[in-house]
Amino acid sequence: MIPAGIGHVVLPLIVVISILLMLARPHAIPEVWWISGGVLLLIVLGLVPLRLAGQAVAKGSDVYLFLMGMMLLSELAREQGVFDWAASAAVRGAHGSCSRLFLLVYSVGTLVTILLSNDATAVVLTPAILTAVRKAKVSPLPYLFVCAFIANAASFVLPISNPANLVVFHTGMPPLGRWLSDFGVPSLLSILMTFVVMRLLFRSELCKSIECEVEDAMLSRNGKLVLVGLGLMVAVLLTASAMKTDLGLPTCLAALVITASVSIKSKSSPIKLAREISWGTLLLVAGLFVMVDAVESQGALNVTQRWLAWATGLGQSVGAMAVGFAVGIANNVVNNLPLGLIAGGTIQAAHTKGLIANAVLIGV
């Protein structure tokens, strides 16, 4: 056990070091080990009671369910060739024009991000796009950049477009109508501006032609079933969002139903899919919930609350710009999950609403 006076120093120090190690990943050790190790150390040293750690983990149940559902669906779609089919269709639809291919890849990336979350675009769609453009024998760089940037630009079109959206708003998630009212125009501008900048940046590469023909990747019956299932799932989630219902459980249940349907139809075991899910990500998020609760209990979020109050004092418009800019920079330095948890905790503790709170989410 550590004396209370020293604990006020040791606790935030352990949290900061754990997050820095998570970002640096020395010796290529996965992020989850650094965060889990930090949480375990906090508990062993008596800085965080086991009961409070359990309560902090329980707070993230909706996020865990959402992540599980989205990861399962993304892996199912990848296994059934949905992403390969989409990438191949984009290349063939370009009809020999790199410029048209750029637009099609951007459109596919936008759609995947909006409906399946930015993780699906970054982790699953990107390799499929890379394979397709290599077969077309064109420079892959513009299209890889597109996947990376649209995963951010379109990540706040809908609540389901980014797990960080659930982390930031947590129990205060706005209903769908208000979400679209608040974020519809900013997200559209984000998507359009990103396209313009990327298009100008790669204008020389996009003036070239695609000389190589690419075979069309046929979508299997199971792949079509997955597509239909995804459409139904999105409809369910939008309905749940409109009714201001938690999104985690509907996402997870929809993913399980779709997976079961495909597994029964194809007479295959879903165990392989379960193995492909990044369970470490769930542990990482759970550990971050514990750490943010721990520093909040020590009053460490008072600094961010004071800064938020200062920004609010500048007025809604100026304050929102300052907050969005600062959070955006911090997001690139740190990571959207720990930053989203800290930002969400600060918003809830300070009871911040309106334009300032929206700017925080856009920054994340």
Predicted segment positions?
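Interfacial loop-to-helix junctions that mark the boundaries of transmembrane helices
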Residues: 1-7, 26-29, 52-63, 176-186, ...
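Intrinsically disordered, low-complexity non-transmembrane regions of multi-pass membrane transporters
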Residues: 1-14, 88, 92-95, 199-230, ...
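Structural signature of hydrophobic alpha-helical transmembrane segments
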Residues: 2-13, 60-72, 118-122, 153-156, ...
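Membrane-embedded alpha-helical segments and adjacent helix-loop junctions characteristic
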Residues: 3, 51-142, 280-352
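Hydrophobic mid-bilayer segments of alpha-helices in multi-pass membrane transport proteins
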Residues: 7-19, 27-48, 60-72, 124, ...
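Hydrophobic alpha-helical transmembrane segments
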Residues: 12-13, 33-37, 64-65, 99-107, ...
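Alpha-helical transmembrane segments and, especially, the helix-loop junctions at the ends
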Residues: 113-123, 140-173, 194-199, 328-344, ...
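Juxtamembrane and boundary regions of transmembrane helices in multi-pass small-molecule transporters
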Residues: 138, 157, 177-221, 225-228, ...
